[in-house]
Amino acid sequence: MGFEWGFKPSSKITQSTVSSQGTGNVMIPTAGVKQKRRYANEEQEEEELPRNKNVMKYGGVSKRRPQPGSLIRGQPLPLQRGMELMNKNQLQQLLVDLMTKHPEIQQSVHTRVIGLDFSIQKCLDMLKQKSEAVYQSIPYNRSYESNKLDDYAFVRMKPQILEFLNCLVDFILDNIPPRLENLHASLKFLDICTELVIKLPRFELASNNYYYDKCIEQLSHVWCTLIEHVARDRIILLADNSSVWKSHMTRLQVYNEHSNGLLERPLQLFKSLDMGSPSAASSSTLSLQESIIYHHDTMTANENNNNSGSAATDSPFN
């Protein structure tokens, strides 16, 4: 008989069991029963082995690992808290991206923006920041005090110049009638804006100063428009002190000298104002209206000439 793996044959187990029952009901363990009990103990040890994996290596104390459901998981900030932490540039870029992806909300956003009342001082602060950006973009190899910056400086400074001039034009149009009914505030704001443009560093090549000259021409038109509003308002002409208008006229004369006569037309309109008697004010109003008609005709002719010639396509003043 060869080696038999496993339990004994069932016939022999049955015979041994019967023989044991015949001897006083005393259970006599056989070899097969012992072997079966040994395998049962091994299976029990294998079942208990995974339970003891959490036993500490050195301490010998069993600790249960926390269940995943009891851990606190991190989560992103709510929308309101996230927007509170965003800076100005991030909020602006987010709004621009949303309007680009969803053009239907542009009108709603524009309606809300134009309904806001921005102070003149806030506009001036923004213009001064953009003006400083122009000066900071000047290359170190040339000084801006000589007003002879080269072509390399123009290429470096062009984006900052256009950004400043675009912002300046937008703010001016938002602070003149009918957007702003206070003529004194409009004139004062226009005066400061003109000074900012006049003081900008200029370039040695005349064609590189195109944006400056075009902007000053547009400022000249705005000056003439405000002077026209002043001439039509007799209360301002008679009630206000003439020194206020003389101060504006004196400063405008200085700007005209620095701009090579580009502000000559509004300067002549200012000189035609008479702050004397009502009859003098009325006559000055008539002469001013005639000058304004001539000014509009001249402006139209200049625009036609500019359109016929070659102009920069990225100019904000075309």
Curated annotation (Swiss-Prot):
Cellular localisation: Cytoplasm; Nucleus
Disordered as annotated region, ranges: 1-75
Compositionally skewed regions (Polar residues) per UniProt: 11-24
Gene Ontology biological-process entries: nuclear protein quality control by the ubiquitin-proteasome system; proteasome localization; protein transport
Keywords: Cytoplasm, Nucleus, Protein transport, Transport
Family recorded in the similarity comment: Belongs to the cut8/STS1 family.
Function: Involved in ubiquitin-mediated protein degradation. Regulatory factor in the ubiquitin/proteasome pathway that controls the turnover of proteasome substrates. Targets proteasomes to the nucleus and facilitates the degradation of nuclear proteins.
Subunit and interaction comment: Binds the proteasome. Interacts with karyopherin SRP1 and Proteasome subunit RPN11.
Protein name (Swiss-Prot/TrEMBL): Tethering factor for nuclear proteasome STS1
